[in-house]
Amino acid sequence: MDDRFVKEINQFFAEIKIQNNVRLVDGKFGKMCVIKHEPTGKLFVKKSVAIKYVTEIEPLVHQLMKDNRYFIKLYYSLTTLKSQILILDYVAGGDLFDFLKKHKKVSEAETRSIVGQLTEALNALHSYKIIHNDLKLENVLYVRHKQIYLCDYGLCKIVNTSSCRDGTKEYMSPEKLKRQNYDVHVDWWALGILTYELLIGHHPYKHSNDNEEDFDLDVLQQRQQKKLHKYNFLSSDAQKFLEAMLMYNINYRLCTYETVIKHSFLS
């Protein structure tokens, strides 16, 4: 860490103030708060990750995707004896989880826009042989009628490395449950789950009366093998898209950028 950077970061931290009126939900491994840079009035997110959970991949993804509009901009990254601190762009508007909770379900037109943008974001990340590995409603920030931001890169993984059942179990693909090597299909399956949640208003495999003890990975795997329920209020294109994204047999599933983006629901 050179002297100029130390001086700059010390000055920045001397000029910020925590905004207690803006609440953020902490992630699995990091605590987050909104801070205001007093001289400019700009809001940032300060993310602190305990040193035992720190990985090199999160700052790397920020660096690789720094010019991509669908990813969060990183301003500063520094590591102390106890934690890694990231200073990130603050995006007003909240995440898709809160948005869906408020609106119950989302129109096909708005879902198409959201999913189309996520498809482009994932393809950009995959071009570096990196998967997000934890795509879910909570990890997509949404400025309504404008754009999405894919966030939280702490569980990103390199394609074709050995996998484990990390991430959020409700979004795990059949292949991930079988502990096959990490591949892009992990993210495309999760996108199918997310699309279903937006259009239908609930998860395709987790029932409202499930508790965490009953809904284990074996139950999830059994339910994934059953055909999806058909909904008459969906268009034929939307129904076919969900079925193709969540086909249990990967040989018949949409699990590449080219097949996803060309589907009639998105085109």
Curated annotation (Swiss-Prot):
The active site is at 134 (proton acceptor). Its EC number is 2.7.11.1. It is an enzyme of class 2 (transferase). Gene3D superfamilies: Phosphorylase Kinase, domain 1, Transferase(Phosphotransferase) domain 1. Keywords: ATP-binding, Kinase, Nucleotide-binding, Serine/threonine-protein kinase, Transferase. GO terms for molecular function: ATP binding; protein serine kinase activity; protein serine/threonine kinase activity. ATP binds at residues 24-32, 47. Residues 18-266 form the Protein kinase domain. Pfam families: Pkinase (PF00069). PROSITE patterns: PROTEIN_KINASE_DOM, PROTEIN_KINASE_ST. It catalyses: L-seryl-[protein] + ATP = O-phospho-L-seryl-[protein] + ADP + H(+); L-threonyl-[protein] + ATP = O-phospho-L-threonyl-[protein] + ADP + H(+). Belongs to the protein kinase superfamily. Ser/Thr protein kinase family. This is Serine/threonine-protein kinase 1. The gene is PK1.
